Amino acid sequence: MSKRAMKKIIPLITLFVVTLVG
């Protein structure tokens, strides 16, 4: 996976985790 894609995916994962935990 390219670093450019990672930069887009990481915030989405973070948001998903925050939604689950919160």
Swiss-Prot record:
One of its GO terms (cellular component) is extracellular region. Disulfide bonds: none annotated. Transmembrane segments: none annotated. The keyword rRNA processing does not apply. Residues 1-14 form a propeptide. Keywords: Plasmid, Secreted. It is found in: Secreted. Signal peptide: none annotated. Acts as a competitive inhibitor of the CAD1 pheromone. IAD1 appears to be a component of its own signal sequence. This is Sex pheromone inhibitor determinant. It comes from Enterococcus faecalis (strain ATCC 700802 / V583). The gene is iad.
